[in-house]
Amino acid sequence: MGSEEDKKLTKKQLKAQQFRKSKEEKDQEKDVKKEQAPEGKRPNSAAGNDGEEPVKKKRKTRRGRGGKGKNGKKGNRFIVFVGSLPRDITAVELQNHFKNSSPDQIRLRADKGIAFLEFDADKDRTGIQRRMDIALLQHGTLLKEKKINVELTVGGGGNSQERLEKLKNKNIKLDEERKERLTKMINDGNQKKIAKTTATAAQTSGTDNKPVPAGIHPDRAKLLK
């Protein structure tokens, strides 16, 4: 009888040990999950437990365009997209190509053949539009014998219909402005050429109208000038 009771007690003890073990394992799993959880998302522990204060959630800060930049200032950046780049392009080569527009920052993704030119309005409020225009005028120029694509982009990312429509309208307007600028440049250049030709012709005619000395053939008189 005594041996049977010992066996029963042993079974009870085993069950108790297994119960304690499973409870300990569950507690450990909870602790691991708490440690792996991102800071700010961990459950708050009650004040007084283990003498620790409740964990305070950290407030996330937004980065990029529209978010707060350094020293709490609001970011005011404009981005120009550059596509169809050669895969072996370097940051130095790209910077040299766009040196006249002087972008404040260049983010190159050579493996995808794209780059982003950032212009900071807080650094240059008066000249930022001119610098962006210079960069955008390089649309279709050759870089390492490859024609590149330069256009405005809309901040925020994503492929929502509203964003794509906004981007499309911006680039249509930009293309029209680019054509107008090129036409104006051509017309200005032609006017300068016409003015130069007219001035040269006036000088030549003024020289030809000089009186020819008596007794000398006009052709010989030209040689004597």
UniProtKB/Swiss-Prot annotation:
Protein location: Nucleus, Nucleolus
Span of domain RRM: 78-155
Any one Gene Ontology cellular component term annotated for this protein: 90S preribosome
Modified residues (Phosphoserine): 45, 160
Region span, Disordered: 1-75, 187-225
GO biological process: eukaryotic translation initiation factor 4F complex assembly; formation of translation preinitiation complex; maturation of SSU-rRNA; ribosomal small subunit biogenesis
Record's keyword terms, sorted: Nucleus, Phosphoprotein, Ribosome biogenesis, RNA-binding, rRNA processing
Keyword Plastid tagged: no
CDD domains listed in its UniProt record: RRM_Nop6
Biased composition annotated in UniProt, kind: Basic residues: 9-20, 56-75
Biased composition (Basic and acidic residues): 21-42
S-S bonds: none
Gene3D superfamilies in the record: 3.30.70.330
Recorded GO MF terms: ribosomal small subunit binding; RNA strand annealing activity; RNA strand-exchange activity; rRNA binding; snoRNA binding
InterPro entries: Nop6_RRM (IPR034228), Nucleotide-bd_a/b_plait_sf (IPR012677), RBD_domain_sf (IPR035979), RRM_dom (IPR000504)
Family: Belongs to the RRM NOP6 family.
Function description: Predicted to be involved in rRNA processing.
Note in the entry: Present with 8970 molecules/cell in log phase SD medium.
Name of the featured protein: Nucleolar protein 6
Species whose genome carries this gene: Saccharomyces cerevisiae (strain ATCC 204508 / S288c) (Baker's yeast)
